Amino acid sequence: MNPIAQSQGAAYSKGHTRNLYADLTLSQDLSGFVKGLGVNFRLSYDNYSSVWEKHSKTFAFKGYSTRWADGPFYTTVSGGESGEMETDASTNDWARQFNFAGGFDYNRSLGKFDIYSQLKWDYEYRDAYGLNTTVYRQNVSWYTHLGFNKRYYLDLALLASQSSLLAPGHKWAFSPTVSAAWVLSEENFMKNVSWIDFLKLRASFGVINADYLPRNGDDTVYNYWDQIYTTTGTMYRFDSGYNSAFGSTYISRLATTNSTHEKAYKYNVGIDATLFKGLNLTVEGYYQRRKDIWVSSEGQYSSVLGMDAPFENAGIVDSWGTEIGLDYTKQISDVVFNIGGNFAWNRNEIKEQMEEPRLYDNLVQTGNRLNQVYGLIAEGFFKDEADIASSPTQNFSTVVPGDIKYKDVNGDGTIDSNDQIAIGYSTVAPEIYYSFHLGAEWRGIGFSAMFQGTANYSAVLNTKSMFWPLINNTTLSSHYYENRWTPENLNAKYPRLSSQSNANNYQTNTIWLEDRSFLKLRNVELYYKFPKNLMQKTKILGSAKLYVRGVDLLCFDKIDVADPESYGATNPLNKSVVVGLKIGF
């Protein structure tokens, strides 16, 4: 062979990623025909592809074989053929998207009336590498805003939408929304209220339709209104071909009948106000009912069905909450200061999800939050063998002193998965978000800071090494070691240390449940703005600002050894301090 040629010139590969983004927007004022009328169009096309090239060639070779038995003797060996470089190319990934939007708009003031109206058609087409990836949607919408005398406002939107993801006969949906507002501060009876600068009441109602569909792990979209068939190999053990695999096709999931859009009924009321010539206030509350949510109907069928149960539009979830925002700016002599904050509280409840019948009430999930944590209630650790003997039997694994002792929730004298109950809050999103900011400036010298926090937020501390040590050859953290149970430390935070997996201790339970709430100093900045007269002397610079900025410098939380936003086996969030100069021309 020719090793040098083979290693250096026999083959190479090249990968190409190609992207095309094209946008076209056209608008035309038609006031010459109808005052206030206009027309607009927009086209966009995105294309992405990944191409892989493979180049290869062959070489002729010559070699020598030497034999020394009766003196040196050489034998020539040759073979192969020299060929031209061959090329093979393939596309291993691609995606494309086309969007079109066009319509008419009308904007005009008629006496005390302000009118804006829009009639629009949208079309979207998406396609990508793989099976069942083509999706198209279209919307026909009409939106109208009407204002009267700068006091009363009415908005109406009507939307008809179509989606290819849903079954024939159910592709179209109608979504109406309406909102109204009343600016009380413009009324004559409010003119003498000096401390109210602006006051508006508003309310809205709408129905939103969505074409969400359940998907499998590779994001494939199935046609759930059809039966799904699966092909597999089955072993027939007879005759000479006993070890051969023969394909078989069977129904793996039943079809969904009358599939439709998921619907959200949204209600909102709010107040916007400006008080005392500087205090801006926003208060609003909302209620939402989502229905026809896609859920599995598996809980409604016996396990002898023999195939996967269909998905159904049967889920119902209620959500409600409130948001409050405050901002106040005031100037006293040469000092300008600003302070404000936001608070949001949100809660939800599962009303229906076709849940299977449960043996005990504590196992029922309907009526609880989305993404609620379920686990066992820990009552401490077993002190000794007598404590174990006098306690309900725990069936997860053999227990010894130092293992977690659980509460018998259902009272059957045995601890197992039937003793799980709702514990803590959601691990996905907190119920409460809040933030507040403050800042001040004096003759160009100033500072600003923004804090952000969460509450009613849970974490399950199941990270191996740190909280579950020595499992599958993982390491042991000093945090666990210092807080483990020992006969001398009966009030420990964590169970005894074990070199083997311990099914009893590593169930989801209140030992591993932690409050994930936190308060962080998100941003803080000290700065100096150079005087304008100095900038004018440069005849080049319009402004200049020297600053020192810090990000995520402080965190107050109850998870001491990890960041509450990234407490798993991942890179921690970074703290940073930046010194910079911002220049404007």
What are the residue ranges of the model-derived segments?
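C-terminal beta-barrel architecture of Gram-negative outer-membrane proteins
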Residues: 413, 447-519
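Catalytic-site beta-strand/loop segments enriched in glycine and acidic/polar residues
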Residues: 117-125, 153-162, 406-429
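Extracellular/periplasmic, surface-exposed regions of secreted and cell-surface proteins
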Residues: 1-56, 65-373, 504, 508-585
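Glycine-rich, aromatic-lined ligand/substrate-binding cores of catalytic
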Residues: 427-460
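Residues embedded in well-ordered regular secondary structure
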Residues: 85-88, 392-403, 479-484
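Active-site-proximal polar cores
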Residues: 61-62
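Conserved small-residue
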Residues: 217-218, 223-224, 331-428, 468, ...
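C-terminal extracellular loops and terminal segments
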Residues: 309-318, 357-375, 423-435, 439, ...
